[in-house]
Design a protein with these regions (language model features):
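Conserved phosphate-chemistry cores used by DNA topoisomerases
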Residues: 5-217
């Protein structure tokens, strides 16, 4: 169920891929509806690292997402009868942004999505259309200001800067529990968010993670 954007011009349009309906609610409220669309990924995502194309193209989560992206797939097989062959001109978005919780489960879901994209539409990664939205790990509040730390090192620097002031520190909640204002500031507003552009070399790290995860099971 895509929550679309108002803008028709591809050069600014962004697709946020989020995990589940709970995240959909907060991201929907935080987005700029003019150019940001949101699609939730529901249920367990297929691990495309090992799955054959027959299984991949029977997975509704994957086929729905590919249809929303719009450019088809770079796979020559009779298994993808409902999806067109790849044509970059049909891509509907300037940025495809994966937005998951800042925890182990969120990292795993992100890895599964990246692996799926690299298996079916590697050109999108090679040409720089795929991004990850960083979510803060900590929210640090003093009497007059709120800070967001995206890792332990940033948390240490912020606490050092605060010095002897009283502060409250909270570890990040799931995206669905965050207020829309915080989501906009830290994850969606182009002026203040942090996006990581995915490079082809990053996929090797994703593959290593998935192999390790499968080994532990």
């Amino acid at each position: 169920s895509l929550v679309g954007s108002e803008m028709c011009i591809r050069d600014r349009r962004e697709l946020y891929i989020v995990e589940g309906d709970s995240a959909l609610g907060s991201v929907k409220m935080a987005r700029n509806a003019e150019f940001q669309a949101v699609i939730p990924v529901r249920g367990k995502i297929l691990n495309c690292l090992k799955a054959d194309y027959d299984k991949i193209f029977k997975n509704e989560i994957i086929t729905d997402l590919i249809k929303v992206i719009g450019c088809g797939v770079e796979v020559k097989t009779g298994k993808n009868k409902e999806i067109s062959m790849f044509n970059l001109d049909n891509l509907r978005w300037n940025k495809i942004v994966i937005c998951t919780d800042a925890d182990v489960d969120g990292f795993h879901i992100r890895t599964l999505i990246l692996t799926m994209l690299y298996r079916l539409v590697p050109t999108l990664i090679e040409k720089g259309y795929v991004y990850i939205a960083e979510s803060p790990l900590f929210e640090i509040t003093t009497s007059d200001k709120t800070y967001f730390a995206y890792d332990e090192n940033e948390k240490t620097k912020i606490l050092k800067m605060i010095g002897n002031k009283k502060f409250d520190i909270q570890r990040s909640k799931g995206l669905g529990e965050n207020e829309a204002e915080m989501m906009s500031l830290t994850t969606m507003d182009p002026a203040t968010r942090r996006l990581i552009k995915i490079e082809p070399d990053d996929i090797a790290v994703s593959y290593t993670h998935l192999r390790a995860h499968e080994t532990r099971r």
